[in-house]
Design a protein with these regions (language model features):
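Short, composition-biased motifs enriched in small/polar/acidic residues
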Residues: 24-98
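Short, solvent-exposed loop/linker segments at the N-terminal edge
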Residues: 32-35, 516-523, 641-647
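Structural beta-strand segments of beta-rich domains
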Residues: 37-41, 523-527, 650-652
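Aromatic sugar-binding surface patches on proteins
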Residues: 73-80, 565-578, 693-695, 703-706
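Surface-exposed, short loops/turns at beta-strand junctions within beta-sandwich domains
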Residues: 83-88, 580-587
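Phosphate/dinucleotide-binding and metal-coordinating scaffold of catalytic cores
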Residues: 95-524, 533-544, 549-552, 601-603, ...
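Intrinsically disordered, low-complexity linkers and terminal tails enriched in Ser/Thr/Pro/Gly
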Residues: 95-97, 484-489, 495-509, 513-514, ...
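Aromatic- and glycine-rich beta-strand/loop motifs that create alpha-glucan
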Residues: 541-584, 597-602, 606-609
Length: 771
């Protein structure tokens, strides 16, 4: 019996052929044991990376193998082999899952309290939020001393024993986490007898806007089955890093509440029913009309006194010196900028496209815990790199509201207490962008064809667990009828929105947008778009939006079809524009908008996801056409005992050699292990190599080390590249580039002294001439 294992992108794949073949294995990638009766697989990968296993007879159609449970890297999954089912020839692969919040799996969580009276303790502590200690177990992992409390507002008030639960994994054990998460939320799916709505909603929302992941969990508490919960990611630093790369900005929550209005009459504020006498931005307003009519937490400008905002918003995380000034300024710009300068001004303080997606999704999914309805129950993140605030979806348990099935798609456009809606949609260009995004959601996400498939998949995932749930407050008949009602709601809502006057106007079509083949850092990059008007309607305008990097506003350039703007020839429907040169390794994001020559200027985007998922290219750089004074001379990709760094650790190292008789200042040069990103790590100021001397750089991701040069990458012993590039001022020319294969431990790879263009394995000689 033989098997073959190889690495292929995001999954490992091996072939099982029931013939006496020799077995091959990509070492340290996936360990396997196959015999006549069983198969054992141990996938390798990044920390907290989870794998699931699939089978195919033809490498086209793959099915999950229920006998092989999903496992995390370095864990083992095993199953008995049924030859009649898998033979005579079969292909197996290990695919990366979405992780702990993958909705295709029910996570079995065990909680243990020392006191059997734990439920009463949690209820007593609900008002204060005080946690009680417990033990958490997931799979083979056990964490002692986690902090547990009840959570939620309306969900806590529900009848029955099952309450929503929050867990601080690192309550007593510093830096403790469960699969990379230090806070867990298990929600009781209040008012949702399908248990699906929050999970469906969040897994669509997160594709377009910062939003928690969501899946399912089955809780066992003190040995008793407490049934199925929504497993929902915390809106914390890990979520921020997931979407923004960094977690360096302030974060606020706009909690549920009532308050001021925004109109003509001064007054101290509003309130709950029957409403208050006034408030809002000067000169005041008619007061909160009761319930959720106020705008005090909806980014309404309420003056310059920070105390007003501190009483309304919760500052969840402070990273800057003046968070309240930042928030007040954003509300001031949003509410008070003059019309002629509004769009330009608001783009500087708000990520407008992200806010429009946020509004669209809350409306389409009829979310009652929403900005359009309550003006609260959302979060805000300030990204200091761009100076703009972004929305973060907060609560999804009231999505798919049946009473709002015919909610107007432009709900709130005339409501001064919802300025994010009323101010943005008052700009014709942004109004059409909002409508275009809503069309995209209806076409790609919120429609019976798509959501019914997901619903059926989710039902298949949880139905058996729901059957065994002793704490559910509904029957299985209600569960199944709820599924039918949910599907009917989706159909009705989709039909209503699709036939709405604003949405039924057909936009132009963009059939293609060019993808640059080799965009260089020394010349402009030309972009073409093939555009056609709808019916007899012509094209009003076509625009190219672009930016370098992952933050900041997009620049806008008009695309023309006049034969003079890199558009091939006039009048052929191909519009052209160019993007200026950027630095080597920069990721340039871009998308195209076309507007109809009709009264509404109906818009369409390519890709349809616009700024939530734009097209991307990475800028290339040229090789130097002269001999480099500094070369890559030797390196070691697996250093166990050969050479310690100044901190005493045995890490990968790269040796550079100054081949000239003069010292060379390489401050601002770059070192990288990725040809697509040659500017990965920059040499700090003062990096000088003496004449005919050597310099060691530690490839160990230890940039905070006080001594030595430590790059922000490691070398792969399986083989990759090392690049040395010049500074930004000299166009990041590739000065030297080595591509290498698999490396042996404690054996270096370097240039032969007698043949300097030849690299071979050798006895290490760091800091000295090579053999």
């Amino acid at each position: 019996m033989g098997y073959l294992i190889c690495n292929l992108r995001k999954y490992f794949i091996f072939t099982l052929v029931f013939l006496p073949l020799k077995g091959f294995s990509d070492k340290d990638k996936i360990k396997s044991i196959v015999n006549d009766t069983s198969i054992n697989l141990i996938p390798d990968g990044g920390k907290n990376t989870e794998w699931t296993f699939q089978f195919s007879r033809d490498l086209r159609d793959w099915v999950n193998i229920p006998e092989l449970s999903p496992v995390y890297s370095d864990e083992e999954s095993s199953a008995a082999i049924n030859y009649s089912k898998w033979g005579p020839i079969g292909f197996f692969r290990s695919m990366q899952t979405e992780g702990f919040y993958d909705p295709k799996y029910v996570r079995a969580i065990e909680l243990t309290f020392e006191d059997d009276n734990w439920a009463s303790q949690l209820a007593s502590n609900y008002a204060t939020g005080e946690e009680i200690p417990g033990m958490l177990k997931f799979g083979d992992e056990t964490i002692q001393g986690v902090g547990i409390r009840y959570k939620g507002n309306t969900s806590y008030q529900r009848s029955g024993e099952k309450k929503s639960i929050n867990i601080s994994v690192d309550k007593t054990v510093v830096d403790a986490d469960l699969k990379g998460y230090d806070t867990l939320n298990f929600n009781n799916a209040n008012m949702d007898q399908t248990l699906l709505k929050e999970v469906l909603y969040f897994n669509t929302f997160k594709k377009y806007v910062a939003c928690p992941g969501a899946g399912f969990a089955q809780l066992n508490i003190n040995g008793e089955n407490w049934g199925v919960y929504s497993n929902v990611q915390q809106q914390d630093g890990s979520l921020i890093r997931q979407y923004f790369g960094e977690n360096s900005g302030d974060r606020w929550k706009a909690p549920s509440g009532r308050g001021s209005g925004a109109g003509d009459n001064s007054g101290p504020g509003g309130g709950g029913p029957p409403g208050g006498p006034g408030g809002g931005r000067p000169p005041g307003g008619p007061g909160g009309a009761g319930q959720w009519e106020s705008g005090d937490r909806a980014l309404l400008y309420l003056g310059d006194d920070s105390a007003t905002y501190e009483n309304l918003y919760e500052l969840k995380k402070q990273k800057t010196d003046n968070p309240w000034e930042i928030l007040i300024n954003a509300t001031d710009v949003l509410n008070n900028s003059p019309d002629e300068d509004f769009q330009n001004s608001v783009e500087k303080v708000m990520a407008v496209d992200s806010w429009l997606w946020f509004l669209v999704l809350e409306n389409v999914f009829t979310d009652d815990d929403s900005y359009w309805h309550k003006g609260c129950d959302y979060m805000i993140y300030y990204e200091p790199e761009s100076g703009r605030i972004y929305p973060i979806e907060h609560d999804g348990n009231e999505a798919f509201s049946a009473r709002d099935v015919r909610l107007d798609p432009l709900e709130g456009e005339d409501n001064p207490n919802r300025p994010v809606i009323s101010k943005l949609l008052a700009v014709p260009e942004l109004r059409q962008r909002y409508i275009a995004h809503m069309r995209t959601i209806l076409e790609r996400e919120f429609n019976p064809e798509n959501l019914n498939v997901l619903i059926d998949q989710y039902v298949k995932t949880i139905e058996a667990y729901v059957e065994e749930d002793p704490k559910k407050d509904f029957t299985m008949a209600s569960f199944r009828s709820g599924i039918t009602s949910l599907k009917n709601l989706i159909k009705t809502r989709h039909t209503y929105l699709s036939s709405h006057t604003e949405l039924s106007k057909a936009p132009p079509s963009i059939s293609s947008v060019s993808i640059p083949t080799v965009p260089m850092n020394d010349k402009k990059t030309v972009i073409h778009a093939q555009v056609e008007g709808f019916g007899d309607e012509g094209i009003d305008s076509v625009h190219l939006y672009y930016r370098s990097g992952s933050t900041g506003s997009y620049l806008k350039s008009e695309m023309l079809d006049d034969g003079n703007h890199d558009d091939l020839e006039a009048g052929n429907g191909v519009y052209g524009a160019s993007i200026p040169p950027f630095l080597a390794g920069d990721k340039v994001r871009y998308y195209v908008e076309a507007r109809s020559d009709n009264f509404s200027k109906t818009s369409v985007f390519y890709p349809a996801t616009a700024e939530s998922d734009p097209s991307v290219y990475r800028v290339k750089s040229k090789n130097t056409d002269q001999d480099s004074p500094v070369i890559i001379n030797e390196f070691m990709a697996s250093n166990k005992v050969t050479l310690p760094d100044p901190q005493g650790e045995f890490d990968d190292w790269i040796e550079l050699h100054n081949t000239t008789d003069n010292e060379v200042n390489i401050s601002g040069w770059y070192l990288s292990d990725n040809p697509d990103n040659p500017r990965k790590w920059v040499f700090p100021e003062g990096s000088v190599i003496a004449a005919n001397s050597f310099l060691i750089v530690w490839a160990d991701e230890d940039g905070k080390a006080p001594e030595g040069l430590h790059a922000n990458f490691k070398l792969s012993s399986y083989g990759e590249s090392v690049l040395l590039s010049s500074s930004d001022e000299t166009m990041n020319l590739i000065m030297d580039h080595i591509q290498f294969g698999s490396q042996e431990t404690d054996v270096s790879y370097g240039r032969l002294s007698t043949k300097p263009n030849v690299f071979e394995e050798m006895i290490p000689s760091p800091g000295k001439p090579n053999p």
